[in-house]
Amino acid sequence: MAKLDANSEFEKGRALSVPVVKVPRSVKEWLCIDRAYENGNFKIEPMTGEAMYDQSYMFEDINYVNKDTAKKDSTLLEIMTLLKSLDGPFKITLANEQRDLDSFVNEIFNPINGQEYPVIEKGIGKWINQKIDEGTRDIRKTMILTVTCRAHSLEEAEAYFATIDTTLSNIFRNLRSRIYKMSAEERMVLLSRMLRAGEECLPPARISPHDSGWKNQILPASIQSDTDYMVINNKQYISVLVGTAFGQSLSEDKVIHSLSDVLFPTYITIDMQRVPKNVIHDRLENAHANNERV
């Protein structure tokens, strides 16, 4: 027998978080983070009692870099499959970040050993020039996992994330990879890099859950919005695309690879929400009975 409320129960899994400010009146109010703690935990929603908290981790995924194209396409999906063992919602962000050219050259081409290894120095110099000509010099890939939970206090959220740390370590060990828990400073630098592409990004001087002044230190001076794009600091244009349904002919791994293998800054976020088995069963039962549109 079909369940009349199957669709509504299924859609509850896609509920949005409560914004800190319903209608932002300044750039500072635009960032939906209620409180930040030095250990890297962020309180996302403003209410007292049960609220949303999250924690971010960075992939130190050497294997991903070294894989061929076919393997790269499937690695992200393999990780997502394993992470389905987590109880709460999570998201994976694949960031193509713009970096400063001088920093890139200093990192790759260190002239200290130039006199000792002149042939190697010359070869690296040619390689750098080749990369500059190709236009790939200022893009780097970063993979971020953000885990979310609902808790009545910071202590309750920290206890949950402590168990998650062990689970994630085991998952990535099986993938022959590593994962690194990010501090508040590191998360803020990441946010700043996204909003101030190509500029030097420094962590806030002071981080306190009772002081939101850190937002002014990482956010741009101005954000203007138009119909289908935003302008940051009158020079950086941002467009946001949201995909909620995909044709069966599309291959997930190829879509992800195509969107991420580009020569300009992009941030691809894949949101995952666990749905109870009984809700999925009712939803499929209704679809089979053709009583609801799916």
Language-model features, listed with the residues they occupy:
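Extended, folded cores of ATP/NTP-driven motor/assembly subunits in large transport
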Residues: M1-V294
